[in-house]
Amino acid sequence: MNKQRGTFSEVSLAQDPKRQQRKPKDNKSSISGTKQEIFQVELNLQNPSLNHQGIDQIYDCQGLLPPPEKLTAEVLGIICIVLMATVLKTVVLIPFLEQNNSFPNTRTQKVRHCGHCPEEWITYSNSCYYIGKEKRTWAESLLACTSKNSSLLSIDNEEEMKFLTAISPSTWTGVFRDSSHHPWVTINGLTFKHEIKDSDHAEYNCAMLHLDRLKSVQCGSSKRYYCKHKL
């Protein structure tokens, strides 16, 4: 449009020379301004890439960013992993830890109730228990417990038996007999009335706790032992 104005001005001046002579300064200024406008328009038309370059850079920068759908999917994936880990911990790990800690918890409760056992002794109910660090014969175990002001293990009830078996599956007890023709007695001289397996063997005259039952074995064999001291 500016180009048309400039052309129209030039034609008008050519047709009216008298008018051109009356105002020479104004026409010269108008022509100069028109030429500048035409040059600016032509420059813009010749270099359209300059205007689009900035726009392309903006779109290129935006293309570097992940779309909102991708970000949402990644966040949901992380949340799912965290939830699965929490469920596995609740279902598997916590019951496992509770099961493994059931006996230590029982001992802790008993210690709080009594709390008078020497160091390295286990407290359960109203008694203290010492676990021998080495295997000994029945007679040697009896002497070792006597030196600790205690007696070789005696079992009062089934609950105590289960508790001790969970700590050590095999140990001497303070039950014996003189021969297969004599009854089983405790070290205190009391008749032992509970069943003892394999009591028909003539040489098996000492009783031990094995798993959840009592069985007769040779008194000269080496076994682990418990010392017991009642509070």
UniProtKB/Swiss-Prot annotation:
<keyword id="KW-0325">Glycoprotein</keyword>
<dbReference type="GO" id="GO:0009897">
    <property type="term" value="C:external side of plasma membrane"/>
</dbReference>
<comment type="function">
    <text>Immune activating receptor involved in self-nonself discrimination. In complex with KLRD1 on cytotoxic lymphocyte subsets, recognizes non-classical major histocompatibility MHC-E loaded with signal sequence-derived peptides from non-classical MHC-G molecules, likely playing a role in the generation and effector functions of adaptive natural killer (NK) cells and in maternal-fetal tolerance during pregnancy. Regulates the effector functions of terminally differentiated cytotoxic lymphocyte subsets, and in particular may play a role in adaptive NK cell response to viral infection.</text>
</comment>
<comment type="subunit">
    <text>Heterodimer with KLRD1; disulfide-linked. KLRD1-KLRC2 receptor complex interacts with TYROBP/DAP12 homodimer; this interaction is necessary for the expression on the cell surface.</text>
</comment>
<feature type="topological domain" description="Extracellular">
    <location>
        <begin position="94"/>
        <end position="231"/>
    </location>
</feature>
<feature type="region of interest" description="Disordered">
    <location>
        <begin position="1"/>
        <end position="31"/>
    </location>
</feature>
<keyword id="KW-1015">Disulfide bond</keyword>
<dbReference type="InterPro" id="IPR050919">
    <property type="entry name" value="NKG2/CD94_NK_receptors"/>
</dbReference>
<feature type="disulfide bond">
    <location>
        <begin position="117"/>
        <end position="128"/>
    </location>
</feature>
<keyword id="KW-1003">Cell membrane</keyword>
<dbReference type="GO" id="GO:0002223">
    <property type="term" value="P:stimulatory C-type lectin receptor signaling pathway"/>
</dbReference>
<feature type="compositionally biased region" description="Basic and acidic residues">
    <location>
        <begin position="16"/>
        <end position="28"/>
    </location>
</feature>
<dbReference type="GO" id="GO:0004888">
    <property type="term" value="F:transmembrane signaling receptor activity"/>
</dbReference>
<protein>
    <recommendedName>
        <fullName>NKG2-C type II integral membrane protein</fullName>
    </recommendedName>
</protein>
<feature type="domain" description="C-type lectin">
    <location>
        <begin position="116"/>
        <end position="229"/>
    </location>
</feature>
<dbReference type="GO" id="GO:0030246">
    <property type="term" value="F:carbohydrate binding"/>
</dbReference>
<keyword id="KW-1133">Transmembrane helix</keyword>
<keyword id="KW-1064">Adaptive immunity</keyword>
<keyword id="KW-0430">Lectin</keyword>
<feature type="transmembrane region" description="Helical; Signal-anchor for type II membrane protein">
    <location>
        <begin position="71"/>
        <end position="93"/>
    </location>
</feature>
<dbReference type="InterPro" id="IPR001304">
    <property type="entry name" value="C-type_lectin-like"/>
</dbReference>
<feature type="disulfide bond">
    <location>
        <begin position="206"/>
        <end position="219"/>
    </location>
</feature>
<keyword id="KW-0399">Innate immunity</keyword>
<dbReference type="InterPro" id="IPR016186">
    <property type="entry name" value="C-type_lectin-like/link_sf"/>
</dbReference>
<keyword id="KW-0735">Signal-anchor</keyword>
<dbReference type="GO" id="GO:0002250">
    <property type="term" value="P:adaptive immune response"/>
</dbReference>
<dbReference type="InterPro" id="IPR033992">
    <property type="entry name" value="NKR-like_CTLD"/>
</dbReference>
<keyword id="KW-0675">Receptor</keyword>
<dbReference type="GO" id="GO:0045087">
    <property type="term" value="P:innate immune response"/>
</dbReference>
<feature type="compositionally biased region" description="Polar residues">
    <location>
        <begin position="1"/>
        <end position="12"/>
    </location>
</feature>
<dbReference type="Pfam" id="PF00059">
    <property type="entry name" value="Lectin_C"/>
</dbReference>
<feature type="glycosylation site" description="N-linked (GlcNAc...) asparagine">
    <location>
        <position position="100"/>
    </location>
</feature>
<keyword id="KW-0812">Transmembrane</keyword>
<feature type="glycosylation site" description="N-linked (GlcNAc...) asparagine">
    <location>
        <position position="149"/>
    </location>
</feature>
<feature type="disulfide bond">
    <location>
        <begin position="145"/>
        <end position="227"/>
    </location>
</feature>
<dbReference type="GO" id="GO:0043323">
    <property type="term" value="P:positive regulation of natural killer cell degranulation"/>
</dbReference>
<dbReference type="GO" id="GO:0005886">
    <property type="term" value="C:plasma membrane"/>
</dbReference>
<dbReference type="InterPro" id="IPR016187">
    <property type="entry name" value="CTDL_fold"/>
</dbReference>
<keyword id="KW-0391">Immunity</keyword>
<keyword id="KW-0472">Membrane</keyword>
<dbReference type="GO" id="GO:0062081">
    <property type="term" value="F:activating MHC class Ib receptor activity"/>
</dbReference>
<feature type="topological domain" description="Cytoplasmic">
    <location>
        <begin position="1"/>
        <end position="70"/>
    </location>
</feature>
